[in-house]
């Protein structure tokens, strides 16, 4: 292959890109609906819930980290964090050695809310989970999504994937099931 030549065709690239776009849009539609239905009784929106979750798993984070790991603009992360602070779920702070960045930490009230939400999670009301259940029943495990993770690693970086994996490991290590509910150990 000559320098500057690509080892894929434009047609191949278009088909792949469109496949990912269409599948992602369809999947997001289900994820968004399920997520909204889960958190609606607690008067939270998806961004607020995501911020609380990130703050919980990171044990505090800068607004920039929240934006990065929450895949949102910094102003979105700040504005929704401010709303959560007003409701007593987060506290803002500055560090002595870093006055430039604003940091947030989940409060006891915020943690209680998040833990209650985790306890209230019902897989029966999750269409993506139910859609994948047939694969689990056939193969004995849920899809691991390694190709999707590899794509996202190339787009967002290894630290994005590390935080993603850490949050899942946190749930694995620090929560248990009791009466078909997820509770903190």
UniProtKB/Swiss-Prot annotation:
Transmembrane segments: none annotated. It comes from the Bacteria. Residues 13-157 form the HTH marR-type domain. Keywords: DNA-binding, Repressor, Sporulation, Transcription, Transcription regulation. Pfam families: MarR. SUPFAM superfamilies: Winged helix' DNA-binding domain. The keyword Cytoplasm does not apply. It comes from Bacillus anthracis. Homodimer. This is HTH-type transcriptional regulator Hpr. The keyword DNA-binding applies. Residues 63-86 bind DNA. GO terms for biological process: negative regulation of DNA-templated transcription; response to stress; sporulation resulting in formation of a cellular spore. Negative regulator of protease production and sporulation. GO terms for molecular function: DNA binding; DNA-binding transcription factor activity.
